Every structure is written in C-alpha cells, then in structure tokens.
C-alpha cells in the first residue's frame, strides 16, 4: 500500500466497528483518539495495532497523524463541531480523506471550500449517509440516461427501535440533518429555507421523508449534467416530518427530534448491545414533465455495520493508489459496478420495490 490508514475516533462506536472491519479485510490501521486506555484495549483486541494520540480540540495533534498519501478516516462528530481539524489536516498534508458525516452543512463545506484546494481525494459522507443514495441515484440515471431531469432519493430505517438502534453520536449529530441553513439542487446547489416532505411507496407501505442536504446534490449532477433537480429525503421522523415542513429549519430540527420522544439522546448513550435496524433506500428518476421513468430500491441491515464495511473498503481502495483529487462522490471515485459490488459486500444491495 502507498500509505497508512489512520482511524481518528477509533474508540467510538462507528470507529471501533470500522477498525474491526479493516482488520477483517486484512489491514492493520493506526488507531487514533484521545483516550489512551481505550485505544490500548482496542489495539490489543485487534492484534497489537499501532495507536496515536489526537484530539480535535488541539488540531496540531490531528495534523501529526498523517503525511502525504496516507489515508485519514474520521468518525469524530458532530462534524460541524469537531470535523474541521481532521479535514484541514488531510488537505494540508496531502493525505486522502474519508469521513462518515451526515451533517449537511459540513458536507457542503467539503465540496465548496476544501475540495478546490485539495491535492488528494476527499470522500465526505462515505457511510450509510450518503453512499447508498449515490448508488441508487446513479443506477437509476444509468438506466434512463439523458431523459432524466429530476432524481429523488429517500433513506429509511425499519426493523427495530430507533432509540436502541442509533448510537449516541448519531443523536448528537441529528440536529445537523435538519439544520437552520439547508440546501437542495435546482440547476445548481441553492439554499432551501424550509423542509419539503414527500411520500415514497416501498414494500407495500407508504413512508414519509423530510428533505435534507446530502452529497447527492453535488455528485449526481456532476456526472449527469442534464439533471435540473435533485432531492434527498430522510425518513426517520414519521409523522413529525409533516410538522417539520411547516417550520423554519432550526425549529424543524427541534420539533422532529422532540416529537420522537424526550430523552432520546440520553437513552441512546445508554444503548446496550446492538439494535435490529434495517435499511431501505430508494431513488426515483423523473422526466422534465414530472413523469416517473424508473425507481431503484436498495435494502440491507444495520446502518452502522454497513458504514464500517464500506468505509473499510473505500479506505483500502484509496490506499492502493488514487490519481483523482478534490471532493468526489463514491461513483466518481470508484465506478458504478465496483461500488454496487462493494455495497453488497457491506450489506446493502438491490431489491425489487
């Protein structure tokens, strides 16, 4: 391999899953974080891996983790609060970068600000948010070609308790999904002051999603310039989605999360064992008159297991050598068929709607 793979946030829930996935794929990553005892315990469990101290509150410690051609994987969130240290470190070092961010405004920063000055490849939102939506959208567009003018992507969970299924870190980051300033794509990425809501039919049910910003708004039009409109929806909040749509963005976040039950974040931090969540992703392509051209449905298991598997795979591919630079989506970085196979390996694959 050309460079080392470093996991920043290795002792967090997603970080530890990612470390185990990499070891399972034959890689010995460097484990980085601020809790020396937890790092030592995880390193010993995984066969004596190298560890390194780094704390996002002290950016120079994060910068010391990587040099040119290394691969920095960061799972440290909320990313709007803690993510910039790793992102800036990778860009400054010329190291490749993958994150598991789902926070829209942070994803936008990577594409709008950091991507243009990077001499390495930056792969933001490289987890359950937003790799499957990129895959489903690209598969739909590949099927219908230039006839597509609009694409709608929806992310949905099922199969178990949302509280037991989601980690504390996800609940801390959840307000960033419905942030005060959101964006969409209408012949370019533009601000969206209020949430939009739409229903998706899947597996004999109607599921409601509320609009969010994602990497799809940047990546799908880049590879399909005929697109005029890209929408991404999150189906976590059920009936609260329609309440959120009537409120300004900041209040929408509080309403949707509050509606799901008081103390969710506190309960999630006490999360014992694994939940039983399943994943469902849909992409629907439309022509310029609003006619449905095709739908692609993906289905799989636990989103955290998927994130760990796909991040581990992506980090390995990048470490083996990348000539591309700047902020990219997963299809542009690796190719459509390769990405579909990798997602299936990680636990999410194509199904009949």
Regions found by a protein language model. Name each.
Residues 53-69, 74-81:
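Conserved Rossmann-fold cofactor-binding substructure of NAD(P)-dependent oxidoreductases
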Residues 32-36, 55-56:
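N-terminal Rossmann-fold cofactor-binding loop
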Residues 64-68, 80-99:
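Rossmann-fold NAD(P) dinucleotide-binding segment
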Residues 8, 142-287, 291-295, 305:
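Active-site-lining helix/loop region of Rossmann-like oxidoreductase modules
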Residues 100-120:
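Rossmann-fold NAD(P)-binding glycine/threonine-rich loop
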Residues 41-49, 113-114:
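Short, conserved SAM-binding/catalytic segment
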Residues 272-353:
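C-terminal helical cap and adjacent loop that interface with cofactors, partners, or active-site loops
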Residues 5-25:
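N-terminal Rossmann NAD(P)H-binding glycine-rich loop of SDR-like oxidoreductase domains
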């Amino acid at each position: 391999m050309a460079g080392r793979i470093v996991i920043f946030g290795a002792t967090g829930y997603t970080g530890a899953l990612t470390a185990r996935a990499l070891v399972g794929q034959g890689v010995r990553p460097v484990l980085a974080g601020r809790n020396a005892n937890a790092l030592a315990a995880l390193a010993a469990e995984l066969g004596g891996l190298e560890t390194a101290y780094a704390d996002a509150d002290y950016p120079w410690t994060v910068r010391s983790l990587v040099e040119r051609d290394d691969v920095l994987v960061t799972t440290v969130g909320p990313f709007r609060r803690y993510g910039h240290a790793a992102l800036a470190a990778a860009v400054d070092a010329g190291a490749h970068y993958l994150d598991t961010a789902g926070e829209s405004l942070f994803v936008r920063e990577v594409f709008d600000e950091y991507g243009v000055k990077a001499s390495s490849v930056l792969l933001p939102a490289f987890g359950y948010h937003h790799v499957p939506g990129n895959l489903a959208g690209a598969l739909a567009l590949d099927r219908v070609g230039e006839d597509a003018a609009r694409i709608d992507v929806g992310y949905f969970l099922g199969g178990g308790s949302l509280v037991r299924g989601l980690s504390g870190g996800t609940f801390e980051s959840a307000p960033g999904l419905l942030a005060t300033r959101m964006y969409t794509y209408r012949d370019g990425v533009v601000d969206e002051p209020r949430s939009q809501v739409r229903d998706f039919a899947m597996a004999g049910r109607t599921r409601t999603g509320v609009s969010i910003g994602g990497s799809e708004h940047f990546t799908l039009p880049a590879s399909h310039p005929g697109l005029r409109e890209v929408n991404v929806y999150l189906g976590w909040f059920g009936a609260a989605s329609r309440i959120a749509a009537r409120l300004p963005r900041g209040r929408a976040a509080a309403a949707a999360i509050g509606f799901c039950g008081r103390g969710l974040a506190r309960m999630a931090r006490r999360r014992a064992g694994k939940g039983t969540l399943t994943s469902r992703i849909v992409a629907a392509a439309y022509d310029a008159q609003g006619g449905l051209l095709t739908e692609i449905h993906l289905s799989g298991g636990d989103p955290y297991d998927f994130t760990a598997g796909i991040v581990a795979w992506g980090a390995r591919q990048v470490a083996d050598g990348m000539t591309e630079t700047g902020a990219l989506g997963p299809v542009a970085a690796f190719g459509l068929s390769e990405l579909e196979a990798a997602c299936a390996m990680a636990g999410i694959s194509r199904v009949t709607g």
